[in-house]
């Protein structure tokens, strides 16, 4: 199952859009791409939003039809993650699981916090730097529960099935064995990455502990079930999420004509990034 990207506009601009295509036709990375690449063997599809070591805060947009990847904004300005020493940009390939939804109408019984109204976040820890819009096949290793401004924001830890280390990584304890320090650094990064923007340190549920593969699979199942309710029009409140899709004929927003109306590719050279984004921030007590 091969996916390609359709870029419109220049990276680092408000007009930048990356749509996902299958066989030349636009599909929604939120709704159309299957969660499972191989359900029997528990192999999942991950949509990459942000390549490792980059700063632009790219995300699958919930509001626009066919859910292209765009750069997030705040007060009309493009958002970038700051460099928190010793890290540069995002610490991992960062993306989302399609066909999942962290329901903002439901509080998780253990975190006591409501979902963040997004697809599940995914951290791919393999050796290769991914690209925006790439659809990777991954195996699940564990999960961290970030409490982001009072909302449950799960971070599923995965590795590309084609990574050389993939055969050795089967659960969360294998990560510490083969990639010592990675989980500690991941915890640190998520705790401090908003501090340069004047926000407080993020908190974790479970005292920052990474839960195992089984726990992560349960979270994925719950969020997939929530998504099923969403696209069926049965969610308590859909929060104005665009449900338009081109493959789910039984859903409330099956709309292949919307996909067909997406403009042709028009990639432009990257716009320059303000030099201030290169700055390193040194945060007391982060090491």
From Swiss-Prot:
Its EC number is 3.6.1.1. Mg(2+) 1 binds at residues 116, 121, 153. It is found in: Cytoplasm. GO terms for cellular component: cytoplasm. GO terms for molecular function: inorganic diphosphate phosphatase activity; magnesium ion binding. Mg(2+) 2 binds at residue 121. Its main location: cytoplasm. It catalyses: diphosphate + H2O = 2 phosphate + H(+). Diphosphate binds at residue 79. CDD domains: pyrophosphatase. Keywords: Cytoplasm, Hydrolase, Magnesium, Metal-binding. One of its GO terms (biological process) is phosphate-containing compound metabolic process. InterPro entries: Pyrophosphatase (IPR008162), Pyrophosphatase_sf (IPR036649). Its cofactor is Mg(2+). It comes from the Eukaryota. Belongs to the PPase family. This is Inorganic pyrophosphatase. The gene is IPP1.
């Amino acid at each position: 199952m091969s996916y390609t990207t359709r870029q419109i506009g220049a990276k680092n601009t408000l007009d930048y859009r990356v749509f996902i295509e299958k066989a030349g036709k636009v599909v929604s990375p939120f709704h159309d791409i299957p969660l499972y690449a191989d359900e029997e063997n528990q192999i999942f599809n991950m949509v990459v939003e942000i390549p490792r070591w980059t700063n632009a805060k790219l995300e699958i947009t919930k509001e626009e039809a066919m859910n292209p990847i765009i750069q997030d904004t705040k007060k009309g300005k493009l958002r970038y993650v700051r460099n928190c020493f010793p890290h540069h940009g995002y610490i991992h390939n960062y993306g989302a699981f399609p066909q999942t939804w962290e329901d903002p109408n439901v509080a998780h019984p253990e975190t006591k916090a409501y979902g963040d109204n997004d697809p599940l976040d995914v951290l791919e820890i393999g050796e290769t730097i991914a690209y925006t819009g790439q659809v990777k096949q991954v195996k699940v290793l564990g999960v961290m529960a970030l409490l982001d401004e009072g909302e449950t924001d799960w971070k599923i830890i995965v590795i590309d099935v084609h990574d050389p280390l993939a055969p050795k990584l089967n659960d969360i304890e294998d990560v510490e064995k083969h990639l010592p320090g990675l989980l500690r650094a991941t915890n640190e990064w998520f705790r401090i990455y908003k501090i340069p923007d004047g926000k407080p340190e993020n908190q974790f549920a479970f005292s920052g502990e990474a839960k195992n593969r089984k726990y992560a699979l349960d979270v994925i199942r719950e969020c997939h079930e929530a998504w099923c309710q969403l696209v069926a029009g049965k969610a308590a409140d859909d929060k104005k999420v665009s449900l338009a899709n081109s493959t789910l004929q039984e859903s409330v927003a099956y709309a292949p004509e919307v996909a067909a109306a997406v403009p042709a590719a028009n990639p432009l050279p990257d716009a320059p990034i303000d030099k201030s984004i290169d700055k390193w921030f040194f945060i007391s007590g982060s090491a």
